[in-house]
Amino acid sequence: MNSAVLNSFAFVKGASFLSAFLFLFLAGCGASIRWRLQNLHLWDSWISTVFVNIFSSFLIGYLIAANPASEVVTILGVGFLGSLSTFSTVIMQSAKTIEDREYWLTVMILGLNIVLGVLFAYIGLRLG
């Protein structure tokens, strides 16, 4: 793999093929796990999204607190946890509730994702 492709990942200077592979593989795993969890239909889809996002926020906080190498943060934090959590789904679910004139649900979806996401990231930082 040429250096221009590796540098496009913008991990750290001199990122290796293994780093790029792990990043892409774990990003795919994170997105697949999120998709599977949301399709279990245990709750309304917005509730699943809240759970996945606060879980990911906690793990990102915990990871950052462990102070690993920047490449590890990129691979695990951005690759896996970034694709496990989802901002775009929150926005699409919120837009759908606005379209359906369920404004209270819109506020709840946005509020829970933001407030609980920040709270659980903080808890992860404190426990890490």
Predicted regions and their residues:
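Membrane-interface helix-loop junctions in multi-pass transporters/channels
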Residues: 2-128
